[in-house]
Amino acid sequence: MTMCAIAGVIKLTQPFEPGPWVDGMLATMQRRGPDQQGVLPLERGTLLHARLAVIDPEGGRQPMTWREGEASFSIVYNGELYNSGELRGELEKLGWQFRTHCDTEVMLYAFIQWGEDCLRRSNGIFAFAVWDHRQQKLFLARDRMGVKPLFFTLRQDTLIFGSEIKTLLAHPLVPARLNQDGVAEIMLVGPGRTPGCGVFQGIEEVRPGCCGWFDEKGLQLHPYWQLKAHPHTESFAETAAHVRYLLVDAIRRQLVSDVPVGTFLSGGLDSSLISSVACHAMAADGRQLHTFSLDYRDNGRYFQPGKFQPNSDTGYIRQMQDFLPAEHHWTVLDTPQLVEGLFEAVEARDLPGMADVDASLLLFCREIRQSVTVALSGECADEIFGGYPWYRDPEIRQQAGFPWAQTSDWRFSFLKKELAQGIDPAAFMNSRCEATLRQTDYLPEDTSEERRMREMTRLNLDWFMQTLLDRKDRMSMYSGLEVR
């Protein structure tokens, strides 16, 4: 497993000349990959990698290359495979011989063996690029849910890609320029982003579940996986047992690591469940779990309940701490710390984000990194299991548009007139919302309420969840911490 940063520059139609921008791009990747950095000059470009080593620190150096006869492939990979052992076993039966214990080699050989079909066989989170030396073309891919980021821009005959926007901006062909749509993205739908949009002019993002080739025909991306509706035939008891199996299996698979592992513990259902399963699984292996909880100075005095958080976390956290035989850690933040963290949070995210919410996660991850390198969190459980108020509130559910943002008037009022000219806030937001709704899959027998619930789920997965995944990735990796 390698949690890190990848980047590359490919120029197909003219001779390629590297420049000082290589060091500039690598410098932007340092925080995501503090352990190792690698550069591979190519016939038509360069592949870059910065690594936070989690599995096989010595054997997993990248970029990684395989050669046999005239065939040669090189990979830069960011992510983790939760079925790495199964894939490795299949490949070994087919004659592949492994030199390392890392996921990178598994993914490289799987791609060479099965091509694009390796993605459908993979259980994990990843973003990677493979250069085919013989055919002089590049393959890009991103995991199904978009946990791992992958941005790109096309400048004439040159493809520039990377794990973060700042890495692309370090190349001289990519100026940090906003057009009218970019301003609208920040002011109207931020901290979210339109799927596939990189906000800065000309910068895009490989969408979740998509892959494709860059060759003399250009960059051609397509989905290899899409969310589909299927009839639910299980009983309530069967559903509960099935969900339990999937959750326990996912948690156990994500505990695999050659470095210390911990869990976020907020006292909620998701983090409590993860911490409990992880604690017992690690105890069986003779390991002790570390849990990490966050509070704010004087939170008990000033806490105000709301729709998103009707209760303070502290009491539930203490109940779980009493229940679990783990080593528990508290982080208490004060307002001055959050204020100082605001600037770093924007630097980490490359864009305006969620203000103190980003800053608190950044500071929390930094504290956690003092004890462990990997942490499991319950991020996005509400998106998958329908935990938000708008799933339960019929009035909100039936309103058109994004359920979490019914109007943008207040935000739009901050723009100067010269910047606001030509932007229709309602039309912009409605067009983005409708584009997402058109991708919703239904069943013929769905009632109007069931259709609306599917639409709500789609909106949450494509917008709200992507915002949280983006936030988690940037804040944690900026701190040198891998959060799963």
Q: What residue ranges belong to the model's regions?
A:
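Cysteine-centered catalytic environments shared across enzyme families
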Residues: 2-348, 361, 433
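Glycine-rich active-site loop/lid subdomains used to bind and stabilize high-energy intermediates
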Residues: 49, 216, 309-312, 316-484
